[in-house]
């Protein structure tokens, strides 16, 4: 599958409301088609060589650009600004949400409120999933930049991909250390709320099955420490949108990183965490059925 179609598919499978925040790959390809091929001729190459001798390769590339190429690069820079603004905004939002969830966990534990603990840990799982989606956002956009710049270099004869990607590696949207830290803190909260001796309940017989995505026919749930709730026969079972999106995102990340066996300067780094799509599904299945019901 071509990257443009793959990107569209991934957006639909993860968080379609982020659609306009992703790389405008189709628009960049349209701009690229406006650029004449062939590398610009001997005169252009000579001009580039003269400027490179005085001011460096980046300045030389800019000086030798046609108006169409300059328009392409302006759009590319605007895309970087878009990624960074959205990514930083989400990180700031996640810092606040993480603190709020930590406070809610502490309050619920202090009151020994089983229902509130169930609600908050469901929200933590959703929150964890959304942060994984943001990591997927970073990886997809990076991959798209690498691919469109490869097309640009091939069409123009320029060699801007490597210096541009080196610049990208320093951008906020690609710097996911803080996001990774938030994800690990989120997992630590879940570890506190999901003790190892608690049996996950994801179906009526009480056996957790991470591969079973069918709707429970007669849902019931046991609460933490032996508390019970009434039968939930009238409540329609719904999987969380973030659970679905997160599993799709993790599969996408795995595919992106395994797309080529050759490691190069443009390869994505390995995932910092060790979550797989199956492990994320299992994490979801640890939440009692009532917390997967429609809100």
From Swiss-Prot:
Residues 204-216 have a biased composition (Basic and acidic residues). Disulfide bonds: none annotated. Residues 1-166 form the SPX domain. Keywords: Nucleus. GO terms for biological process: cellular response to cold; cellular response to phosphate starvation; negative regulation of unidimensional cell growth; positive regulation of cellular response to phosphate starvation; regulation of leaf development. Residues 197-227 are annotated as: Disordered. One of its GO terms (cellular component) is nucleus. It is found in: Nucleus. Involved in plant adaptation to phosphate (Pi) starvation. Inhibits PHR2 DNA-binding activity via a Pi-dependent protein interaction. Suppresses the regulation on expression of PT2 by PHR2 and accumulation of shoot Pi. Optimizes growth under phosphate-limited conditions through a negative feedback loop of the PSI (phosphate starvation-induced) signaling pathway. Regulates the expression of SPX2, SPX3 and SPX5. May be an important link between signal transduction pathways related to phosphate starvation and cold stress. The SPX domain is sufficient for inhibition of PHR2 binding to DNA. This is SPX domain-containing protein 1.
């Amino acid at each position: 599958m071509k990257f443009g179609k793959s990107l569209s598919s991934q957006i639909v499978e993860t968080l379609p409301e982020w659609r306009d925040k992703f790389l405008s790959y189709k628009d960049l390809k349209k701009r690229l088609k406006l650029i004449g091929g062939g590398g610009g001729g001997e005169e252009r190459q000579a001009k580039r060589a003269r400027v490179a001798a005085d001011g460096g390769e980046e300045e030389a590339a800019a000086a030798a650009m046609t108006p169409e190429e300059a328009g392409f690069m302006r759009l590319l820079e605007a895309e970087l600004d878009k990624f960074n603004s959205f990514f930083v905004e989400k990180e700031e939002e996640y810092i606040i949400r993480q603190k709020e969830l930590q406070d809610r966990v502490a309050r619920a534990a202090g009151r020994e409120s089983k229902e509130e603990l169930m609600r908050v840990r469901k929200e933590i799982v959703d929150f964890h999933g959304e942060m994984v989606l943001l990591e997927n956002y970073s990886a997809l956009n990076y991959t798209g930049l690498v691919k469109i710049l490869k097309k640009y270099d091939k069409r123009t004869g320029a060699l801007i991909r490597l210096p541009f990607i080196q610049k990208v590696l320093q951008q906020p949207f690609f710097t996911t250390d803080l996001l990774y830290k938030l994800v690990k803190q989120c997992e630590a909260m879940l570890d506190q709320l999901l003790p190892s001796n608690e049996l996950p309940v994801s179906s009526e017989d009480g056996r957790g099955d991470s591969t079973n995505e069918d709707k429970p026919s007669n849902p019931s749930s046991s609460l933490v420490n032996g508390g019970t709730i009434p039968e939930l026969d009238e409540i329609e079972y719904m999987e969380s949108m973030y659970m679905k999106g997160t599993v799709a995102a993790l599969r996408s990340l795995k595919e992106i990183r395994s797309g080529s066996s050759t490691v190069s300067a443009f390869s994505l780094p390995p995932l910092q965490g060790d979550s797989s799509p199956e492990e994320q599904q299992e994490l979801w299945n640890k939440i009692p059925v009532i917390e997967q019901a429609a809100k």
